[in-house]
């Protein structure tokens, strides 16, 4: 990665850290979602928990035991590394956490192979990623800055994107989970141990990074409370996010 791109990436990290400090809706959502991730982690005694693509480092606020990493180093990160070429010994990790990372990887299948190699039996990959539903698709496809291409093969050698770490295809995680049998056939040491859809309209209404919440905070919290009571079947139609757990056999 050239120096100009490294500087650009670090600037984005800093922008996101400032947004975290000033945006209550953002902290609420991401705090909840990292809480969901924590619930799915294996016992820490199994081995280190490593987050890939930690970027601004929000995870430490909810899961202080996590070791943080990214392709570009920063003072709050413990490792600078490539998720597709992990610098760890075979069977040395307890968990790999990816939060909005899988859909940015140039070669998702290479990462899955590295997960098989580095995780101990019983170790887990826990991923919080975009979910493409009938309601979220037009938002991801036509409004969001990242692309959403449902035509790609998520296990193909060139499934993802390259170059800028912030480029991505938000369809990759959904496409991968739709091909569950193929994933488990190609990587028999990985079993899909959990899958959950969540986050309805309260997510885009939060404004995300760099935008103000679209509703008064009181109304936004009311919308979030309503969504908390909705069953999974509803999020099949309106969900914007997913949590997936892959367990090393």
Residue ranges and their predicted role:
Residues 235-249:
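Core SAM-dependent methyltransferase catalytic element
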Residues 85-90:
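Short conserved loop adjoining the S-adenosyl-L-methionine
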Residues 109-124:
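A short glycine-rich, Lys/Arg-flanked "PGG" loop and its adjoining helix->strand segment in the class I
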Residues 170-195:
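Short alpha-helix
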Residues 125-159:
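Conserved class I S-adenosyl-L-methionine
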Residues 97:
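A conserved beta-strand element that flanks and buttresses the S-adenosyl-L-methionine
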Residues 1-84, 242:
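Conserved N-terminal segment of class I S-adenosyl-L-methionine
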Residues 100-101:
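Short catalytic micro-motifs in class I SAM-dependent methyltransferases
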């Amino acid at each position: 990665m050239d120096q100009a791109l490294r500087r650009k990436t670090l600037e984005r990290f800093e922008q996101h850290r400032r947004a975290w400090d000033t945006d209550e809706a953002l902290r609420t959502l991401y705090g909840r979602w990292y809480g969901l991730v924590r619930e799915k982690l294996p016992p820490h005694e199994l081995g280190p928990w490593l987050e890939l693509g930690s970027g601004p480092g929000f995870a430490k606020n909810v899961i202080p035991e996590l070791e943080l990493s990214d392709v570009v180093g920063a003072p709050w990160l413990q490792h600078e590394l490539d998720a597709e070429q992990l610098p760890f010994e075979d069977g040395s990790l307890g968990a790999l956490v990816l939060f909005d990372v899988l859909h940015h990887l140039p070669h998702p299948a290479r990462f899955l192979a590295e997960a098989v190699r580095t995780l101990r039996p019983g170790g887990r990959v826990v991923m919080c990623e975009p979910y493409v539903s009938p309601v979220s698709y037009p938002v991801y496809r036509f409004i969001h800055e990242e692309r959403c291409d449902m035509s790609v093969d998520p296990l193909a050698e060139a499934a993802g994107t390259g170059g800028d770490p912030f480029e991505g295809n938000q369809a990759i995680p959904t496409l991968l989970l739709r091909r569950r049998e193929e994933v488990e056939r190609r990587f028999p040491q990985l079993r899909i141990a959990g899958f959950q859809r969540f986050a309805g309209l309260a997510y885009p209404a939060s404004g995300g990074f760099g935008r103000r919440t679209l509703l008064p905070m009181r109304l936004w919290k009311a919308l979030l409370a309503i969504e908390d009571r909705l069953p999974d079947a509803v999020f099949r139609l309106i969900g914007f996010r997913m949590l997936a757990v892959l367990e090393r056999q």
